[in-house]
Amino acid sequence: MEVNGHHKPRREYNGRECNGVQSVNNFGDIDPWTAWAYKPRTVSLLLMGTCFLIWASGALDPERSFSVDRVSSVKRGVFAMIAVFLAYSFLQAPSTVLIRPHPAIWRLVHGMAVVYLVALTFLLFQTRDDARQFMKYLHPDLGVELPERSYGTDCRIYVPDHPKSRFNNVYEILFDEFVIAHILGWWGKAIMIRNQPLLWVLSIGFELMELTFRHMLPNFNECWWDSIVLDILICNWFGIWAGMKTVRYFDGRTYEWVGLSRQPNIISKVKRTLGQFTPAQWDKDEWYPLLGPWRFIQVLSLCIVFMIVELNTFFLKFCLWIPPRNPLIVYRLVLWWLIAIPTIREYNTYLQDRKPVKKVGSFCWLSLAICILELLLCIKFGHGLFPKSMPSWLFIAWTTVASLLMMFLLVWTWKIYRTMIRKRL
């Protein structure tokens, strides 16, 4: 964080360097009012955590723990195990490129991602029925088969004989929970990716994914006006527009991040405090997909991973019997959003890095690992649930697209290679 303000000379503290990024610059750059939050107090917090564990576990009072039933003891033990790991991540996990609102927050997100990765690994070794029943431990309403709603049973816009309303089909879809989810989701993606052409590729690409897998999931069976007009041209467009407006608004302003103690009045102090929860930099990410064949493949890989994560939401919901309004769906989406924020920044930094030998950041690695495990869960638990095969015309269409893409990349690579040979001669 860059802070402008006068301060007394202090002993310089060099923060840990992780993936080539300095986690904390030095204490001299931190405002005096908030400098305490950047000083390491790992031993003190360890002693406080130990005292809490002694109280919660009844280590000094074994008779009290005997009165608790076995199921409750196991639940408490699992939650305590997760809490200890998250506390360790909060204090000692590797820092990322993000420094707002505090590097420790993103270390905590790193720990939550590892916990989610381990939980997915555990589920992968269960049967489908056992996994469905295990979900009851996470939410009591789960473990029950659910009816899957289809949005394309009646695609008429005007229904003259409907008892409620002649436009009832439109009203039902307009007031569906997925409308708000579309807008908020694309607003969040626009803030993360900050590149409008790439966002539109993802928007249209996901609608093509819905068309591709509509024979497997009734939820993807939508009317043409729902998919094209409502989803792409209204909800997705509004979310992308609002997100890019947010980025341009903050990107076009000049900031002097004066410390909290130097703000002139209460209103300024409140604004500065709220500003701590916004990104330090709002500059738009440049991906340059047409820089070369390899860069094109790298950006295309990002789009593919994005769409796989989106598809995993619906397939996991279908396979594990999780209703759309269950809070677990929201928790997973919020966790993925928190993971994706540093992942996008790390991946963009990785693409822009000119070093001959480089590696992706820890969040990039975790995101890819979680995506793969979710996909494996969908494949394993979805076995036998989708009796309908893909229509032949759809298979031919995607095969043609893949073949044309391969030919395009080969011709592009050959032209670049031929140009390099001519320059050497």
From Swiss-Prot:
It catalyses: a CDP-1,2-diacyl-sn-glycerol + L-serine = a 1,2-diacyl-sn-glycero-3-phospho-L-serine + CMP + H(+). One of its GO terms (biological process) is phosphatidylserine biosynthetic process. It is found in: Endoplasmic reticulum membrane. The keyword Membrane applies. It is an enzyme of class 2 (transferase). GO terms for molecular function: CDP-diacylglycerol-serine O-phosphatidyltransferase activity; L-serine-phosphatidylethanolamine phosphatidyltransferase activity. It is a multi-pass membrane protein. Its EC number is 2.7.8.8. Pathway: Phospholipid metabolism; phosphatidylethanolamine biosynthesis; phosphatidylethanolamine from CDP-diacylglycerol: step 1/2. One of its GO terms (cellular component) is endoplasmic reticulum membrane. The chain crosses the membrane at residues 42-62, 79-99, 105-125, 197-217, 224-244, 296-316, 321-341, 366-386, 393-413. It holds the Pfam family PSS. Belongs to the CDP-alcohol phosphatidyltransferase class-I family. Catalyzes a base-exchange reaction in which the polar head group of phosphatidylethanolamine (PE) or phosphatidylcholine (PC) is replaced by L-serine. This is CDP-diacylglycerol--serine O-phosphatidyltransferase 1. It comes from Oryza sativa subsp. japonica (Rice). The gene is PSS1.
